[in-house]
Regions:
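A short helix-loop-beta-strand connector motif used in the catalytic cores of GNAT acetyltransferases and
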Residues: 53-66
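Short linear motifs in intrinsically disordered/low-complexity regions
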Residues: 21, 43-44, 52-54, 79
C-alpha cells in the first residue's frame, strides 16, 4: 500500500514502493537528467536508491518521496529531505529529481516547497539546505524559488558545489 505523506494542488508525495523501480530508473539512469551527477545509475544503483529511501523512512521518518500527478497518478519524480554530507557536516537537504518529460512545469519547485514546509512542521530543523554543482543552474533556480540563498561554495572531490540555505 502506498503511504501518502502530503499533497499539493497538482501533486501527491508518497513513500516509494518497490513498484516505482521502472519510473525511477527512467529518471536516474538518463544521461541528460543526471548530467550534474558523477554518472547515471545502473539497475543496481536504482535499487540502492530505493533501499536507501526505505531505510531513511524507518530511521529518520523522512527521505525522498515519489511524486505523482494528482490527476493521473503518473510517477514523475521525487522530492524530499535527506541527510547529506555538505562540506564535512551531515545536514538536512531538500532534494528533487523530475522526469525530463515534465521539466519546466514547476513540478520540482512545487514538490520541494511542500517537502520544505512539511519538514519544518514535523521536525526540529533549524535550517534546510540544498547543494548542487555550480553548473546546475536549473537546480539553483529551484532552490531560490524556495527562498534559499547562497551561503558558500566548497570543493568536494572534483566538483565545486554550491550550498544554499
Amino acid at each position: 500500500m502506498k503511504k501518502v505523506i502530503l499533497e499539493t494542488e497538482r501533486l501527491v508525495l508518497r513513500e516509494y514502493v518497490q513498484e516505482d523501480f521502472s519510473g525511477l530508473k527512467e529518471i536516474i539512469s538518463d544521461d541528460e537528467t543526471m548530467k550534474y551527477y558523477v554518472k547515471p545509475y545502473d539497475d543496481a544503483g536504482v535499487q540502492r536508491w530505493l533501499d536507501w529511501n526505505f531505510d531513511n523512512y524507518k530511521k529518520h521518518g523522512f527521505g525522498l518521496f515519489a511524486i505523482e500527478l494528482r490527476k493521473t497518478g503518473e510517477f514523475v519524480g521525487d522530492a524530499g529531505i535527506t541527510l547529506q554530507p555538505i562540506d564535512g557536516e551531515w545536514l538536512p537537504e531538500v532534494g528533487y529529481h523530475v522526469n525530463k518529460n515534465f521539466w519546466r512545469r514547476g513540478i520540482a519547485s512545487e514538490a520541494a516547497r511542500a517537502a520544505r514546509d512539511w519538514a519544518f512542521s514535523n521536525f526540529e530543523f533549524d535550517a534546510l539546505y540544498s547543494y548542487m554543482t555550480v553548473e546546475n543552474i536549473p537546480s539553483q533556480a529551484t532552490a531560490r524559488s524556495l527562498g534559499m540563498t547562497k551561503i558558500k561554495e566548497y570543493f568536494d572531490g572534483e566538483e565545486i558545489l554550491r550550498c544554499i540555505k
